[in-house]
Amino acid sequence: MKVIGITGGVGSGKTALLEYIRIHYNCEIILADEAAHHVEEPGQECYEELVELLTPAILNEDGTINKKRMAEEIFADDSLLETVNGIIHPAVRQYILSEIELQRSLQQIDFLFIEAALLIECGYLDIVDEMWYIYAAEEIRRKRLKEARNYSDEKIDAIMQSQLSEDEYRKACHFVIDNSGELENSFEQIDRKVREYL
C-alpha cells in the first residue's frame, strides 16, 4: 500500500481530483478537515481546550462548535490561529497514523490518500511515501472561491496568507498536478502517475 499526501492552496481543486481518484482506484481517502471536525466534537480530545481558548461564544445551541464562527475568529488573528493549530493538528495526526496502521494491517487497498492544505507544515512528509501538490494559478483559485463558496476578497487573502507559497509547495512535493485548466487534463496527469505504481 502506498501512502500519498495531497496538498495545495485553498481553491486549487483538491476535492474534485480526489473524487476522481476515489472512483477510479482501489484506495481510501482521509480528509484532514473531516478528521479535524471529528476531534473537535463534544467528548473528543480537542473540544474542551478549544472552548476554553475561544470561549463558549463559538458554540451552537446544541453545544457543538460553530465552524464558521471559529474560522472567522482564528483567521483574523495569526497567534490565535497558531494556538488552535497547535491543539488540533497533533490530534489529527494521531488519528491519521492510526488509520494508516489499520489499512496496512487489512492489506485491502493499493493506495491511501491523505488530503490537507497543511500537510507539509504539520510534518507529514515523514509519514507519506509521496507528497503531491495540486497547483492552480492564483486568479483561477480566487474565481473558484468566489463562485463556489461565495468568499470575499478579504477572506481569500486571509486564508492564502496563512498557507505556503507556490514555491514552498513545489520544493517540498514529489509530484505536481497542474489543475488550472480542464479537469480532464488533470485526470490524465493522475492516471499517468498512478500507472507507475500498478
Residue map of PLM features:
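Hydrophobic anchor at the beta1->P-loop junction of P-loop NTPases
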Residues: 6
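P-loop (Walker A) phosphate-binding loop of NTP-binding proteins
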Residues: 9
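ATP-binding Walker
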Residues: 12
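Walker A/P-loop
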Residues: 15
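Short beta-strand-centered segment that lines the nucleotide-binding/catalytic pocket of NTP-utilizing
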Residues: 27-40
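ATP-dependent small-molecule kinase phosphotransfer cores
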Residues: 37-108
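NTP-dependent small-molecule kinase module
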Residues: 98-111, 125-130, 134, 139-151, ...
